[in-house]
Amino acid sequence: MAELTTLARPYAKAAFEHAQAHQQLASWSAMLGLAAAVSQDDTMQRVLKAPRLTSADKAATFIEVCGDKFDVKVQNFIHVVAENDRLPLLPEIAALFDLYKAEAEKSVDVEVTSAFALNQEQQDKLAKVLSARLNREVRLQASEDASLIGGVVIRAGDLVIDGSIRGKIAKLAEALKS
């Protein structure tokens, strides 16, 4: 996975810099998201792996499948990615692009998993506290996992805060073993 990210990074960075310069971050994010989804389709996977097709043929097929959903700049981007045999990296390119976009917009996607459903007031309060701590706008996604027993697990990028009962029991068990 790290190798794929390394290969995808220059393409994501170039796309991000272009989109940012032209104030098109949202549209590029949507188009790259579509490209990532199309590249993961089973039929498209076979096309991308076909040894008899040239990179130009693969790019043309890819763009044709997406129809008018791509503007000219994204079509050119797809051609460049195809010329370097990197179309299978589109999901990683799109993910990195979205990370760069979130960083530029000073926002972060936060996943909160709790043992019980959080009501809207609790979610708003948690988002406010996290926003202050992370110094970013927080987009909160809440889910439930009864196996946590109690508490919450918060994931924001590389940051993981495990305040669950299950996590505390695991730490206690580890401490008792050593």
From Swiss-Prot:
- Has keyword Transport? yes
The record's GO molecular-function terms, alphabetically, read: proton-transporting ATP synthase activity, rotational mechanism
Keyword list (alphabetical) reads: ATP synthesis, Cell inner membrane, Cell membrane, CF(1), Hydrogen ion transport, Ion transport, Membrane, Transport
The membrane-topology field of this record reads: Peripheral membrane protein
Q: Pfam families given for it?
A: OSCP
Compartment(s) where it occurs, according to its Swiss-Prot or TrEMBL record: Cell inner membrane
Origin: domain of life: Bacteria
Entry GO CC: plasma membrane; proton-transporting ATP synthase complex
Fetch the Gene3D superfamilies from UniProt. N-terminal domain of the delta subunit of the F1F0-ATP synthase
Q: Does the keyword Metal-binding apply?
A: no
Q: Which PANTHER family match?
A: ATP SYNTHASE DELTA CHAIN (PTHR11910)
Q: What does this protein do?
A: F(1)F(0) ATP synthase produces ATP from ADP in the presence of a proton or sodium gradient. F-type ATPases consist of two structural domains, F(1) containing the extramembraneous catalytic core and F(0) containing the membrane proton channel, linked together by a central stalk and a peripheral stalk. During catalysis, ATP synthesis in the catalytic domain of F(1) is coupled via a rotary mechanism of the central stalk subunits to proton translocation.
UniProt family annotation: Belongs to the ATPase delta chain family.
Oligomer status and interactors? F-type ATPases have 2 components, F(1) - the catalytic core - and F(0) - the membrane proton channel. F(1) has five subunits: alpha(3), beta(3), gamma(1), delta(1), epsilon(1). F(0) has three main subunits: a(1), b(2) and c(10-14). The alpha and beta chains form an alternating ring which encloses part of the gamma chain. F(1) is attached to F(0) by a central stalk formed by the gamma and epsilon chains, while a peripheral stalk is formed by the delta and b chains.
List, alphabetically, the HAMAP family matched.
Answer: ATP_synth_delta_bact (MF_01416)
The name this protein goes by in its record: ATP synthase subunit delta
Task: Give the species this sequence originates from.
Answer: Pseudomonas fluorescens (strain SBW25)
